[in-house]
């Protein structure tokens, strides 16, 4: 185990290291956002593309939940899924929250839903779909590779929107505010479940996490291409 994962004993620690080397926050597109270098049109295009991933994401969580062999694990994942779907008093599903952000970027719901997916967006959605259904370990690794990055991403996105783009509308920021907090708990759940995997399944989780992290960065490269940003 330790040799296969560069000396890491815990699966989650090995995945953390792999994801850090494939960080979304280190991608030039997100760095440009943080610096205020993206145009309004680029942010609008991003809002339209990323919506399709946000809308598809609960189905990946559902597949991981369905494949989980542990009743306790299923309960924990069900709480994650309920959060994504907006189940509970006073909660909104996360696709609806994203539409609030898109509206703040100048794209109404009809425009967002009608937007054609670029190849990199299609690849991200299909990669997540495939990994979440391949096996429980694979889906869990992919889920962790995504959700473990979201609190830091959300924090920097809020900072960039407020300080660089003058965004003050609560509806525009709410998606990121929710994820800055909720995905700390979600990633903790995934970490606990990853480190409880049988030894024979840990390599699958690690490989899936690496594949999903690459697909996330490829999505951002697609946004560079679509918006004419130098790659």
Residues of each region from the PLM?
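Non-heme di-metal
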Residues: 2-231
């Amino acid at each position: 185990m330790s040799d296969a994962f560069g000396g890491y004993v815990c699966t989650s620690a090995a995945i953390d290291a792999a994801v850090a080397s494939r960080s979304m926050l280190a991608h030039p597109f997100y760095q440009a956002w943080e610096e205020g270098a993206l145009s309004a049109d680029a942010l609008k295009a991003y809002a339209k593309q990323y919506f399709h991933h946000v809308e598809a994401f609960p189905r990946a969580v559902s597949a991981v939940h369905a494949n989980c062999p542990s009743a306790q694990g299923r309960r924990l994942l069900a709480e994650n899924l309920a959060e994504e779907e907006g189940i509970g008093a006073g909660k909104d599903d996360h696709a609806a929250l994203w539409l609030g952000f898109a509206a703040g970027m100048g794209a109404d719901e009809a425009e967002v839903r009608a937007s054609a997916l670029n190849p990199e967006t299609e690849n991200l959605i299909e990669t997540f779909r495939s990994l979440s259904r391949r096996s429980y370990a694979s889906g869990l690794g992919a889920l962790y590779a995504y959700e473990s990055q979201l609190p830091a991403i959300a924090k920097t996105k809020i900072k960039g929107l407020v300080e660089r783009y003058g965004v003050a509308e609560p509806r525009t920021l709410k998606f990121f505010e929710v994820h800055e907090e909720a995905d700390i708990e979600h990633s903790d759940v995934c970490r606990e479940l990853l480190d409880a995997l049988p030894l024979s399944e840990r390599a699958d989780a690690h490989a899936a996490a690496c594949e999903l992290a690459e697909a996330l960065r490829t999505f951002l490269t697609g946004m560079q291409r679509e918006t004419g940003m130098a790659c």
